[in-house]
Amino acid sequence: AQIEAEGYYPALFGKNALSISNSTINATSTGDIAIFTRGNLSIENSKVEANAPQDKKGIKARKTTTINQSWITTTGDESYDSINDSVLFNGNDGKVIGNVTVIGEETVSSEKTLIISEGTTLTIPDKAKFTNNGTVVVNGTIINNGQITCTNHSGGKATCIQKAVCELCNQEYGDLLEHNYSTKWMNNEEIHWQECTVCHNHKDE
């Protein structure tokens, strides 16, 4: 299902429980919590965006919250009892939890940062698209069988002979660095020189 919901409190409400599966939800509350249930909350294989006023939770359940294989964006600072193999954005700060597979298309917008920590994996499967317009920090694993587009590259290390390679999309970017000359002087019978530690270029005295 694809749902756009807006209300004062809450935008999306489950009296006894709330289950979201294989869905795209955009819920905005103008007065309080965006998505709320008095019982248990379950989110699976879904994309959920919850927008609430400042200092209010975006998503809340009075009992347990279980999230699996989903992409969650909330304006609140909440954490959840059980969240597995999902992406969680609290405001502009996002993280990959476990082993996440992108469903359809996902975009990191210009003001957001997504951290792929060591031991976690972000997979872009065949026909899926992942776009980075913000900042993606890759300390874990990227598996790309689909399409990655970066308007803002990150990671990699440039040298005097090799531009930096983006750790997300594997494309070169930026400029070459200046030579890194050794502090040690070398010489023969005619000249003295310093040598670049990378490409061995000579800088004569």
Regions found by a protein language model. Give the residues of each.
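Long terminal segments
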Residues: 67, 78-92
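Polar/charged side chains located within well-ordered beta-strands of beta-rich proteins
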Residues: 65-68, 74, 90, 106, ...
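Tandem-repeat/low-complexity and Cys-motif detector
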Residues: 7-15, 32-40, 55-63, 79-82, ...
